[in-house]
Structure formats: structure tokens, C-alpha cells
């Protein structure tokens, strides 16, 4: 969704993934390979203004994404490239000054490794060199291909506190999250900070 949104706004976009999607976006350059390959990873920052990482820490990426992002931090800092990371909602506070979503949500054991990776990535960015311009995106609690949401063309932003609707639910569609991300790329407001986006 981020690739489609950015390309639709006229940006030059290169997508790095294991395989080209079944429905490629017109005008996007697709590079196939594994980002566990250090040489391929290094290419992501070449001729780039912004690198945005959206890798899921599942399958053979479980336990490896921290290593990839550590390398991206070094590569982006050396190249003077802005680095964005798509994380999770677990580090967001449920209320001002309150506990993290992770501390009160009682996640299923099978998703704990993914959650802990998201927390570790934010910590790695926070500990990165001051010269690196980064941003970390925490989507709403209900987000993903398995949670289809209405596309509204709108979103709300919070620094650290969970955003919910009138029913107390936190959700966002992939397309609207992509809009929030590309808006931040075009008009940066969150330098070395996280933001949370929801409907």
C-alpha cells in the first residue's frame, strides 16, 4: 500500500522483496532478492532520499529483522538517508502516562516474538546515532490484511497514546496508513520519533 500511494503521488519508488507482486504498480522498480543479503541491503540506500522498512518478522525472518534494521541504521546514517520503520502498536501507551498496550493486551504466545521484535526495533532506533533521521510508525491495534477496514482517506495521528473511536476500538486500513506514511515522507514532522496512526 505504501508503494502504491507513493508511486501514485509521482515519487520514484524502488521496492525490494522476495518476489514481484502479482499486480505490480505501474512505474515502480522491483528488485527481487533477500534482504539478508548484505550487498542487496546496501543497495537500498543508494540514490534514495528515504528508505522505509516493512518486513514481517515471520518465517525465516523471525529473529533476523533486528539484524537487518541494525545494518539499515548504519547504512542510512552513513548515506544521509532518512529511515522509516513500520512497527507495531505494542509500545503505544493506552493512556497519557499509562502502561503500554503490550503490558495490558495479553497477546497470544505465538505472536510474542513478532511483538518483541517491534519493541526492539524502536529501541534500536532510539539508541541510534544522533545524526540519523528516523521515524517509526505504530499502526492502530486492529490493522493488517486479515482485518479489512474501510478506506476513508483520513487518519488521526498521536505521539505515544492509543487512538480509539467512539466504541473504544483502534483500527485503520492499509490504504489510510499508507497515506499517513507518505504524508510524513513528503512533509516530515517526526524526526527521531515514533508516531501512531488510526482512524
Language-model features, listed with the residues they occupy:
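Oxidoreductase cofactor-interface core, primarily capturing Rossmann-like NAD(P)-dependent enzymes
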Residues: 1-26, 37-38, 59-61, 79-84, ...
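NAD(P)H-binding glycine-rich loop region in Rossmannoid oxidoreductase-like domains
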Residues: 21-79
Amino acid at each position: 500500500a505504501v508503494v502504491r500511494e507513493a508511486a501514485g503521488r509521482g515519487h520514484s519508488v524502488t521496492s525490494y522483496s522476495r518476489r514481484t507482486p502479482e499486480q505490480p504498480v505501474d512505474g515502480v522498480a522491483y528488485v527481487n532478492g533477500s534482504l539478508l543479503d548484505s550487498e542487496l541491503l546496501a543497495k537500498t540506500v543508494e540514490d534514495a532520499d528515504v528508505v522505509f522498512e516493512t518486513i514481517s518478522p515471520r518465517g525465516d525472518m523471525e529473529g533476523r529483522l533486528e539484524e537487518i534494521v541494525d545494518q539499515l541504521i548504519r547504512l542510512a546514517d552513513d548515506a544521509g538517508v532518512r529511515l522509516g520503520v513500520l512497527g507495531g502498536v505494542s509500545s503505544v501507551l493506552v493512556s497519557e502516562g499509562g502502561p503500554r498496550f503490550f503490558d495490558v493486551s495479553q497477546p497470544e504466545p505465538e505472536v510474542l516474538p513478532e511483538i518483541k521484535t517491534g519493541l526492539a526495533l524502536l529501541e534500536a532506533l532510539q539508541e541510534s546515532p544522533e545524526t540519523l533521521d528516523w521515524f517509526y510508525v505504530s499502526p492502530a491495534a486492529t490493522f493488517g490484511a486479515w482485518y479489512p477496514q474501510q478506506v476513508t482517506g483520513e487518519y488521526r495521528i498521536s505521539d505515544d497514546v492509543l487512538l480509539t473511536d467512539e466504541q473504544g476500538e483502534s483500527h485503520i486500513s492499509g490504504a489510510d496508513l499508507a497515506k499517513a506514511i507518505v504524508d510524513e515522507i513528503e512533509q516530515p514532522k517526526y524526526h527521531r520519533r515514533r508516531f501512531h496512526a488510526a482512524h
